[in-house]
Amino acid sequence: MSKLKQKSEFNIDAANLLIKEAYYASSIHCSYYSCFQLMKFTINDFFGIDYEAQSVEISTSGQHTHQYVINFVSNELKRFVGIGESQSFKRTIKDLKQLREESDYENIEVSLDMSQTALDKANGIRQYLIKNFNV
C-alpha cells in the first residue's frame, strides 16, 4: 500500500479517536488531511502522475499545493461526471479546508459539532474518491 494512502487512512482513524477524546481541533486537522492525502494518491494512482511530477506541476502552476490538488481533482471530475458533481465536490472540500484553517489558525473554541461536521464531510469525500476513482 502507498505510504500516502496509508497516512490518509491513519488520519481518518485518528480523527475518529480524537473526537472520542474531545480533542476537537486536532480531529478537524486529521479529517482534512485524510482527504488531501487521498486526493494526492488519486492523482498518482488513477491519473498516473507520480509524486515528483506533481511537485513539478505545482511549482510551475503558480498555485499553492492544496489549491492545485483540489483544482486538479475537481477539473477531472468535470470531465468524468459533469460540472454539477464537480462543483459539489469542490464546495465540500473547500468547506472542510475552511474548517481546518479556522481550527488550526483562529483563536476560537472548536466544538464537537464543528469536528463532527468536518468528519462527516471527510467521510463523504473519501467515499466519493474511493468509489469514483477505485483508490
Model-derived regions, located:
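Terminal alpha-helical segments
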Residues: 1-135
